[in-house]
Design a protein with these regions (language model features):
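Nucleotide-activated sugar donor-binding and catalytic core shared by glycosyltransferases
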Residues: 1-405
Length: 405
């Protein structure tokens, strides 16, 4: 039976991967400040469990990526979703919060909302980039959407959906003023040399498409800038092995890159410019206040299908450029982005070298990044998890019939 939401609510959270576990852990802490006697249940990882969360299933059950892998595990995932929905309907928590993982969570949320439970979706899918009509499905699934980016709530508002910007948690974890000197000391990189950080992707499949192109581009820049230091952080041991093979064929020992185990944040901070694959890493580079050149390729078939079905809603892809437009910094590209057929070693090298040699341009980019960092923190006091907890607490204090609309 539902608990008294004003005293000891039963709050269900469903996190599907490592990033969701971190968001969930921060959210549990923030909600517990408001509801010390609350009980937290659902699916979560080690970080959430350390906060007193009761996980009914192993979070790794949901950690599948890529179309082929999802298809292979689909029967198991459907069985898990059915069991989870049944248990949540039996327990009837005061609110159910799906954290990211939209392919799994939205179906769960929709079934529960239809049954009269309050539902929240934390982390909006990228409706600003492609398939905006997904907002309507999300609205059928969630009473409230908690957004990490300021351009997202207006999109939902067009569809009559309650969405709140709560700030981006990464914006809380990155300092507003970056420490290049400290980062170079940590990596034992001299303070007086130009440094290029190269991040060609964190997944083996990305490296297979981009690794050779990015390292060839870096080598071209090194040939044009004697004394350049190149640092490449490896996201995990498998990626390190792939990068080691690529670096092994570099040839010129003097300009050979420094390959790191992890330490992507330090590598970005130490750099003058970052050459990286499009994705979350571009947001991290922006919050590190590092000018960047962004490149990416998907398979030609995937790209043609997306174009043919008009699934892409934007003509820019790098998050800093999308945010710059959304926050009123104009339509010009803040950072160079080279996508698909334009993502060649020659083009990446040319854009990177131009940025390395233009200190005035780099200063302009850094100033814009400082502004965007503040925008992602939002105008309210406190951290993103606190804003998210406030939005959930407000829903908890609303009668269920009203919350369901």
């Amino acid at each position: 039976m539902p608990t008294n939401a004003r005293q000891a609510p039963l709050i269900a959270l469903i996190a599907g991967e490592d990033s969701g576990d971190q968001l969930g852990a921060d959210l549990v802490s923030a909600l517990r400040k408001r509801y010390p006697d609350a009980r937290f249940v659902g699916i979560g990882g080690a970080r959430m469990q350390l906060k007193g969360f009761e996980s009914w299933y192993d979070i790794r059950e949901l950690s599948v990526m890529g179309f082929a892998e999802v298809v292979r595990h689909l029967p198991r995932l459907l069985k898990l979703r059915k069991a989870l929905v049944a248990r949540l309907l039996a327990e009837r928590p005061d609110v159910v919060v799906g954290i990211d993982a939209p392919d799994f969570n939205l179906g769960v949320e929709q079934r529960l909302k239809q049954a009269g439970l309050r539902t929240v979706h934390y982390v909006s899918p990228s409706v600003w980039a492609w398939r905006e009509k997904r907002a309507e499905k999300i609205g059928r699934s969630a009473d409230r959407v908690l957004c990490l980016f300021p351009m997202e709530p207006p999109i939902y508002a067009k569809h009559g959906i309650d969405a709140r910007f709560v700030g981006h948690p990464l914006a809380d974890r990155f300092a507003l003023v970056s420490d290049r000197v400290g980062a170079r000391d940590v990596l034992n990189v001299p303070q007086n040399v130009p440094v290029l950080a190269v991040l060609p992707g964190s997944r083996p499949s990305e490296l297979a498409r981009l690794g050779t192109i990015f390292l060839d581009a870096a080598k071209r820049v090194a040939q044009a800038m004697p004394g350049l230091r190149i640092i490449i952080p490896a996201a995990n041991p498998r990626v390190h092995e792939q990068l080691q093979t690529l670096v092994g064929s570099w040839g010129d020992v003097e300009s050979a890159p420094l390959l790191l185990d992890g330490k992507a944040h330090e590598a970005m901070l130490a750099a003058d410019v970052v050459l990286l694959a499009s994705g979350t890493a571009t947001l991290e580079a922006m919050l590190s206040k590092r000018p960047m050149v962004v490149g990416y390729r998907v398979s030609p078939t995937s790209y043609r299908i997306a174009r043919a079905l008009n699934m892409l809603k934007t003509d820019v892809y790098a998050l800093p450029n999308i945010l710059a437009r959304a926050c009123g910094l104009g339509n010009d590209l803040l950072v160079p982005e080279l996508m698909q057929d334009d993502c060649t070693a020659a083009n990446l090298a040319s854009a990177t070298l131009a940025l390395m040699q233009d200190s005035e341009r780099r200063g302009h980019v850094v100033a814009a990044f400082e502004f965007l960092h503040q925008q992602l923190r939002g105008q309210l006091e406190g951290e993103a998890a606190d804003h998210a907890a406030d939005a959930i607490a407000e829903l908890l204090e609303t009668p269920a019939a009203t919350a369901a609309g």
